[in-house]
């Protein structure tokens, strides 16, 4: 089966008056349709740059990116992107934020778009908060709105750049559990998820991509052979989880030493 997304020898160099910085070098990666891929690596290894290339916010300096087997250039509107900052429009209510992507794509009637947004908010525990503005929502609530805003128009590939990074530990666990549930309800949806948290990467992913120190490349891809559905609150007690964690950490620790 053709991967939904492929990177072939992708490199990205940033140029400035002070010289060149090679963020990524010769990245080869296939992402299969319907899988959950997590990405870890030392700070500054180009993880966010990788997602920006995937969605088309920037072009590779060298190499090729394929979407469903065809060269992809420019912004790919088939791909959803959830950032660490919630980026909610402060002048729009939660309901209006969720319906934004539907409005831009003119999906359904206005009433149908509002109804879908309302149902999604209820699905993530925000019934009754439809008319609240960003400043009236907690950080966890904002990120729930941010996630379902992307899910609303049903992209087949969703990129997530440390979406739970700023949140407290308990809220992170709750949203990890919610994300797995929402993904499980959408067969065929593919997720690529960046995180600094190895426990999060293993608990969520089908595979963990370990990036090298800058310039970033794929050092190792570690399969996560844990059954689904997963209990996010207890999976870390599984002996198999510990073995996978140790394997991922061994690769990452070496790269962190290189980055110092």
Give the ranges of each region predicted by the language model.
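Conserved ABC ATPase "signature" region
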Residues: 103, 110-129, 180-181
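Helix-to-loop junction immediately C-terminal to a conserved catalytic motif
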Residues: 55
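The feature captures the beta-strand-to-loop junction immediately N-terminal to the Walker
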Residues: 40-42
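Conserved ABC transporter NBD signature motif
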Residues: 63-75
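Conserved signature/switch motifs of ABC ATPase nucleotide-binding domains
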Residues: 132-135, 153
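Helical segment within the ABC ATPase nucleotide-binding domain
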Residues: 172-187
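A short, flexible loop at the N-terminus of ABC-type nucleotide-binding domains that lies
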Residues: 1-4, 13-26
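Short coil-to-helix segment of the ABC ATPase nucleotide-binding domain corresponding to the Q-loop/switch region
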Residues: 92-100
């Amino acid at each position: 089966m053709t991967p939904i997304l492929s990177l072939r020898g992708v490199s990205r160099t940033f140029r400035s008056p002070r010289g060149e910085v090679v963020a990524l070098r010769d990245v080869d990666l296939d992402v299969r349709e319907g899988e959950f891929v997590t990405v870890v690596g030392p700070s500054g290894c180009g993880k966010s740059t990788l997602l920006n290339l995937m969605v088309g916010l920037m072009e590779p300096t060298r190499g090729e990116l394929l979407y469903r087997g065809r060269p992809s250039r420019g912004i790919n509107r088939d791909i959803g992107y959830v950032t660490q900052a919630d980026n909610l429009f402060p002048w729009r209510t939660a309901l209006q934020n969720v319906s934004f992507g539907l409005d831009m794509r003119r999906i359904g009637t206005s009433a149908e778009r509002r109804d879908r947004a309302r149902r999604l908010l209820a699905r993530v525990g925000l019934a009754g908060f439809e008319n609240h503005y960003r400043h009236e929502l907690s950080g966890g609530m904002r990120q729930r709105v941010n996630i379902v805003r992307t899910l609303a128009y049903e992209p087949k590939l969703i990129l997530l750049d440390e979406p739970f990074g700023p949140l407290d530990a308990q809220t992170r666990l709750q949203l990890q559990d919610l994300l797995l549930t929402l993904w499980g309800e959408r067969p065929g949806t593919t997720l690529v998820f960046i995180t600094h948290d190895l426990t999060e990467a293993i608990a969520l992913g089908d595979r963990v991509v370990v990036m090298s120190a800058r310039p970033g490349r794929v050092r190792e891809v570690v399969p996560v052979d844990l059954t689904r559905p997963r209990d996010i609150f207890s999976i870390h007690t599984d002996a198999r989880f510990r073995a996978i964690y140790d394997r991922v950490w061994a690769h990452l620790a070496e790269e962190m030493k290189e980055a110092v």
